UniProtKB/Swiss-Prot annotation:
It comes from Campylobacter jejuni subsp. jejuni serotype O:23/36 (strain 81-176). GO terms for biological process: translation. It holds the Pfam family Ribosomal_S20p. InterPro entries: Ribosomal_bS20, Ribosomal_bS20_sf. The keyword Nucleotide-binding does not apply. NCBIfam families: S20. The gene is rpsT. Coiled coil: none annotated. This is Small ribosomal subunit protein bS20. The keyword Nucleotide-binding does not apply. Binds directly to 16S ribosomal RNA.
């Protein structure tokens, strides 16, 4: 347990930050999984729709500071390659 007022504040901030990061990390995994599943099923329309949602969500995470810009671009690029491979 924290003994100083500033340490108590840091503990509160850490809890909030951890919850926020857990939310974004879970969301990132789920939207990525949705695109990959649609691509694996060969459903081009569903994969394109999932890719649009993923692109928007991933770049929103950049603006919130959860992931870096280059990381987001790499993830979206790899998902787009996967979707474009569907015959």
């Amino acid at each position: 347990m924290a003994n100083h007022k500033s340490a108590e504040k840091r503990a509160r901030q850490t809890i909030k930050k951890t919850e926020r990061n857990r939310f974004y990390r879970t969301r990132l995994k789920n939207i990525t999984k949705a695109v990959r599943e649609a691509a694996a099923n060969g459903d081009k329309n569903a994969a394109n729709e999932a890719l649009k949602v993923a692109n928007k969500s991933i770049h929103a995470m950049v603006s919130r500071g959860f992931i870096k810009k280059q990381t987001a671009s790499r993830r979206v690029s790899r998902l787009a390659l996967l979707v474009n491979k569907i015959a």
